[in-house]
A protein has these predicted regions:
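Polybasic/polar functional segments that serve as interface/processing modules
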Residues: 1-109
């Protein structure tokens, strides 16, 4: 496995972990169906863009451990696009990167 693949998986997983904490906080605050700001889960470790998602939209992505939500246009060229919406794109990691992110899924721990 290349270092670039491992780094990409690490970066996306780190953003996903942060979003899981945001999700827990949204639940504590009782935000209900209102859109919640989530971090873009792209592979750029410097990205700070936010995506407003309903909790249902977020849970639809998180139902699959290899899927990530990114700002539209932030997907990598080799990404498998699962869903495109005006506000966001859902991508699925494949190959070695997919195995790495699935192993780091906080919901599988």
């Amino acid at each position: 496995m290349s270092r670039a693949v491992a780094q990409a998986a690490e970066t996306a997983s780190t953003f996903r972990d942060a979003n899981e904490q945001l999700e827990a906080r949204a639940d504590e605050l009782g935000l209900g169906a209102r859109p919640t700001p989530y971090l873009c889960e792209c592979e750029d470790g410097r990205c700070t863009e936010l995506i407003a998602l309903t909790r249902v939209e977020y849970e639809e992505v998180r139902a699959y451990p290899k899927r990530f939500v990114v700002v539209a246009g932030h997907q990598e060229a080799d990404a498998r696009i699962v869903q495109e919406a005006p506000r966001f794109t859902v991508v699925e990691k494949i190959g070695e990167e997919g195995k790495l992110v699935a192993a780091r899924d906080p919901r599988a721990r």
